[in-house]
Amino acid sequence: MAKSNWLIYGANGYTARLVIEQAIRRGHKPIIAGRTEAKIRPIAEQTGLDYIVFDLTDGHLLKKALSNVKLVFNAAGPFIHTSQKLIDACLKYRVNYTDITGEVPVFQNVFLYSKQAEQNKIVLMPGIGFDVIPSDCLAKYVANQVPNAVELDIAFTGLEHISPGTLKTMVEMIPGGGLIRRDGRLIPSHLGKGSKKVIFPDGEHTVVPIIWGDLETAYHSTGIPNITTYMAYPNFMVPFLPVGIPVMQRIFANNFAKRVVQRLIEIVVKGPDKAAREHRRAYVWASAKNSNGDQKRAWLDIPETYSFTAIAAVVSIEEILSVQPKGALTPAMAFGPDFVLKIEGVKRYDNLPAQNNK
């Protein structure tokens, strides 16, 4: 029997369409929703799914939309603009909340509602895609094997081709500068500086510190007070980042310029095509250390990031509806570090082949 007890908001977005495909493949019939009927109705007609059109500022329609579902999956980014109203409604009407954010402020905000979510017997679980399931689970995995770990580094590859929504979110975040976690606190850092080399399953990459959701989520999952998150960049780009990023920060600090660029992104950027999604791989690395010098490293080899997100989001929703966790939780907090291995196509390594592990 098809399961139609959850709703996708922002169903017309690039990633949302992939999630819908996976949901249908796995026997679900989610209700699809968004702000604009001209964008939502064609998807409903193509898929045979029920739909509802509403703006998040319309409390009456929001209540109606949530009245017959057990879970909301928010796919409408940047989530800093959409998550609060949906979280408020989910708490009010006792509906589980999920999304695919990677935005640190959104994670910080969600954790403020943990006790209220627990009292209302629902879960608030942001980040059920590439942000942050693989890194969250891998961080928890290595942390569990290093007693009293004090330092956690996380790095990944695989964002060479990104969706309009991801790029718009990056434009939103760049003006704020970089972040790292030190002694349990988030502190500013210089975007584009601090590169290092990391060995991944496909070889060595240069990685550079970036703002990633794990700066907040991994702190809750592991309790480790010092966390840095990195992304792989092509070697030719690395020398230009310390100069280029400050220029972008100044440009995108102007709200008009930022909105123009985000509108251009909507028009021009299409996201990875089917061939890229089917054939590319992404890799995640995590390292935990303690003050005695004990260290544990591990790697994940996963499908292309958007393919992974589509599968992972639906598997997460299934797990939430089955296990019924309560509170504001990360995926690893709710389901454990091995949860990522339930997702099709994922491999975890404690050691790499000799040719790569130098």
Question: Where do the PLM segments sit?
Answer:
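N-terminal Rossmann NAD(P)H-binding glycine-rich loop of SDR-like oxidoreductase domains
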Residues: 6-26
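Active-site-lining helix/loop region of Rossmann-like oxidoreductase modules
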Residues: 9, 144-290, 294-297, 307
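N-terminal Rossmann-fold cofactor-binding loop
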Residues: 33-37, 55-56
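Short acidic/histidine-rich motifs immediately flanking catalytic phosphotransfer sites
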Residues: 47-48, 66-71, 92-95
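Conserved Rossmann-fold cofactor-binding substructure of NAD(P)-dependent oxidoreductases
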Residues: 53-81
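ADP-ribose/adenylate-binding Rossmann-like module
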Residues: 89-107
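Rossmann-fold NAD(P)-binding glycine/threonine-rich loop
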Residues: 101-122
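C-terminal helical cap and adjacent loop that interface with cofactors, partners, or active-site loops
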Residues: 271-358
